[in-house]
Amino acid sequence: MSTPIFFDLDGTLTDPQQGITRCIQFALEQLQQPVPDAQALTWCIGPPLHQSFVELAGAELAEQCVVLYRQRFARIGLYENQLYEGVPELLSQLRNRGNDLFVASSKPRVFVERILEHFELIQYFSGVYGSELDGRLQDKGELLGHALAMEGIVGSDSVMVGDRHHDALGAV
């Protein structure tokens, strides 16, 4: 049996910087908060969105920021995203070798699925896991635990591929 492989989405399969930073700027602007330039917001790619907005606008405005962010993201931001070169070929090769492939992202699952469909990658994955819009499963460790349980996979028999410390911590 080949090793099941879990991939993060943002920063691993795609470069979401433009969409994420523009949506953060939009949310902050709408609430008349200081708006950092896009480069100063790259640290927000990876961790749960609510957590980033707590740091940017404070706990009292974080939920409003998330709502505004998602309004723009659902219409525009998810398409302000670039597929990394070679990703489709890699996924195809892994599937042809017999690996079961999964996505495990702290981004809401509904958006993950739309992005995978947009880039015609959905066909390579046996399962797609993401957080829920109500905030459940934002923690990468909790999300991976859920995905492993749903798929009947032992964690030590699988691999997590990601780009941030949240991915590494979640896989432990």
Which residues make up each language-model segment?
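Acidic di-acidic motifs
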Residues: 16, 162-163
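Short, acidic loop-to-helix structural element flanking the phosphoryl-transfer center
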Residues: 75-103, 109-113, 138-141, 145
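N-terminal helical cap/lid subdomain that shapes the substrate entry/recognition surface
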Residues: 2-88
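Substrate-recognition "cap/lid" segment bordering the active-site pocket of phosphatases
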Residues: 109-159, 165-172
